[in-house]
């Protein structure tokens, strides 16, 4: 959906990445000149939500002040939920150097909400060390009504592939459609409604440093994902009581507590720790207009930095519509072996390096130093293409989660019926063209 700046306000969004926002659902609900007055307006409670250390450098410090009907501490004790699908352990299956690809999973046959529909495919690191990521799919056909969720282990980058999501959060509401993403910060409580009845997509659970926009270097002051295109919600609250359930993900396990009111009761807030969404179709793609296919880092949307300069814990990269103008060059992504590990998904269309087998809703994994690249059909076609004319790739959106650590599949992923056992054959048809007598 393309909205003007005026329409953004009417739809309940504020523009900018990690801005210092201020919003209130009732006039005068935000205290003036202080964060924690002796008595907050409307009888609200003041509560700070911290996403970074108190002493983090100001440029990286994230926190928001919430003014809510009841404090977040009001709930019954948590008890652990026994389940085996939404995981943060990645040591149950030895990682394989084999290239792996999965067909799109089927929708559930029984009523399943967003939280119950999450299944972990792979990951590395863990929440205890606050580094690495979990990579999940979600498959849902039922809205969450009297159930709420928060993740204490990491922020969640959610990539819808089929069906819209209405993210009703403590800080406001975000409607997200395929080819948009939404990021829910660590600790923010929310529920998910399904406007289209069912939904499918991908999640990157970031255990490390918060996602940020990459530096642009010699690109200059504009390009890639522009800050103004990130949208955060305006304050919106629920004031209802009942027999509700609060689910938490904590140290790799799910926990449930009873709660007698909706925890989405924030009437006003200010700060820079907030959910946000971004339309991937707004990405300003940079590419070569002379020769060669540049490195895929030019398609970087968000990064989670590590302690090593130039090395990220997670890179979120997209491959959308774009012009290819390189002359006398092989235009698809080239054959590659990478120190990093790559998990890919396809939101819509066809990925330009794979003519067949990689379907929307599917996924692939190419781990550290595992060879990958265009399949035989793509190679032959691109090798014979007329590169004197530009070519536009249209109606596609693929993405990649790239990490420096090996991405370790879970038992579910390794044993899934959707795992394509014949994936390796897409390269077996590559012909030998070498002739030492002909250059």
Curated annotation (Swiss-Prot):
Enzyme Commission numbers on file: 1.13.11.5
InterPro entries linked: HgmA_C, HgmA_N, Homogentis_dOase, Homogentis_dOase_bac, RmlC-like_jellyroll, RmlC_Cupin_sf
Protein's organism: Cupriavidus necator (strain ATCC 17699 / DSM 428 / KCTC 22496 / NCIMB 10442 / H16 / Stanier 337) (Ralstonia eutropha)
BP-aspect Gene Ontology terms: L-phenylalanine catabolic process; tyrosine catabolic process
Binding-site residues for homogentisate, renumbered to this chain: 351, 372
Protein name, UniProt field: Homogentisate 1,2-dioxygenase
Keyword flag Metal-binding: yes
Coiled-coil segments: none
């Amino acid at each position: 959906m393309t909205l003007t700046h005026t329409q953004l306000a009417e739809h309940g969004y504020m523009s900018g990445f990690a801005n210092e926002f201020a919003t209130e659902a009732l006039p005068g609900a935000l205290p003036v000149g202080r964060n924690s007055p002796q008595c907050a307006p409307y009888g609200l409670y003041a509560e700070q939500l911290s996403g970074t250390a108190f002493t983090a450098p100001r440029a990286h410090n994230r926190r928001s002040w919430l003014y809510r009907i009841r404090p977040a501490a009001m709930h019954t004790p948590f008890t652990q939920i026994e389940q085996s699908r939404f995981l943060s352990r990645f040591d149950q299956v030895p990682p394989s150097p084999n290239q792996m690809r999965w067909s799109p999973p089927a929708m559930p046959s029984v009523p399943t909400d967003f939280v119950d529909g999450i299944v972990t495919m792979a990951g590395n690191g863990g929440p205890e060390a606050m580094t690495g990521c979990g990579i999940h799919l979600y498959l849902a056909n039922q809205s969450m009504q009297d159930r709420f969720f928060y993740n204490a282990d990491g922020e969640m980058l959610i990539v819808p592939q089929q069906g819209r999501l209405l993210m009703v959060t403590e800080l406001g509401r975000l409607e997200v459609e395929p080819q948009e993403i939404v990021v829910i910060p660590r600790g923010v409580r929310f529920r998910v409604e399904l406007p289209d009845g069912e939904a499918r997509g991908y999640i990157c659970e970031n255990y490390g440093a918060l996602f940020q926009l990459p530096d642009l270097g010699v690109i200059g002051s504009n390009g890639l994902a522009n800050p103004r295109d990130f949208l955060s919600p305006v304050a919106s609250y629920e004031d209802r009581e009942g027999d509700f359930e609060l689910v938490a993900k904590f140290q790799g396990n799910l926990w449930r507590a009873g709660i007698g009111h909706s925890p989405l009761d924030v009437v006003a807030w200010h700060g820079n720790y907030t959910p946000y969404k971004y339309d991937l179709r707004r990405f300003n793609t940079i590419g070569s207009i002379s020769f060669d296919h540049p490195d895929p880092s030019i398609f970087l949307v968000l990064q989670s930095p590590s302690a090593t300069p130039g090395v990220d814990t997670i890179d979120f990269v997209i491959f959308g519509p774009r012009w290819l103008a390189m002359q006398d060059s092989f235009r698809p992504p080239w054959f590659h072996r990478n120190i990093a590990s790559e998990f890919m998904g396809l939101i819509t269309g066809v990925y330009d390096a794979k003519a067949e087998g990689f379907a929307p809703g599917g996924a692939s994994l190419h781990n550290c130093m595992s060879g990958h690249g265009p399949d035989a059909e793509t190679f032959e076609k691109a090798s014979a293409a007329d590169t004197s004319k530009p070519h536009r790739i249209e109606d596609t959106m693929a993405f990649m989660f790239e990490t420096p650590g090996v991405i370790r599949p879970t038992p579910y992923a390794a044993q899934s019926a959707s795992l394509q056992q014949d994936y390796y054959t897409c390269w077996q048809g590559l012909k030998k063209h070498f002739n030492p007598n002909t250059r």
